[in-house]
Regions:
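N-terminal leader segment of winged-helix/HTH proteins
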Residues: 1-11, 56, 82, 112
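N-terminal helix-turn-helix DNA-binding core of bacterial DNA-binding proteins
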Residues: 2-43, 49, 65-75
Length: 128
């Protein structure tokens, strides 16, 4: 019972749904996500931990960086994520996707530093 409650709790927050929708496009590191959402890193990390605890996302470490992806190994969780995706319109995600795209372009052009985003200014990003 607690497992299903954790899943629904994780899916009941707009920010977490936005994170899942972004991860639907592929693996992202924390700096990618907080730049896309225009939020501070600790807040995004909290939401990522809730999603991970619910078994909705998985992570992998690459050096000192952590990359997140949707964990689709469980059929029920995958179904719930896809159901949530259907309820989120592209218009709802337009600004997040634009910020993510701009951040990824900037990060690529600045050899991973992403210095355009004030939150991570003067600190290295995930090195992609």
């Amino acid at each position: 019972m607690q497992e299903i409650l954790n899943i629904f709790k994780a899916l009941s927050d707009e920010t977490r749904l936005r994170i899942l929708k972004l991860l639907g496009g592929g693996d992202l590191c924390v700096c990618d996500i907080f730049s896309a959402l225009d939020m501070v890193q600790p807040k995004v990390s909290f939401h990522l931990s809730v999603l991970k605890e619910a078994g909705l996302i998985a992570d992998r470490k690459e050096g000192r960086w952590v990359h997140y992806r949707i964990d689709d190994s469980d059929l029920l969780r995958r179904f719930l994520i896809l159901t949530a995706f259907e309820r989120i319109s592209e218009d709802d995600m337009k600004e997040d996707k634009q910020r993510l795209s701009l951040f990824l372009e900037t990060k690529k052009a600045s050899d991973g530093n992403g210095s355009r985003t004030a939150t991570i200014k003067k600190s290295k990003c995930c090195g992609r």
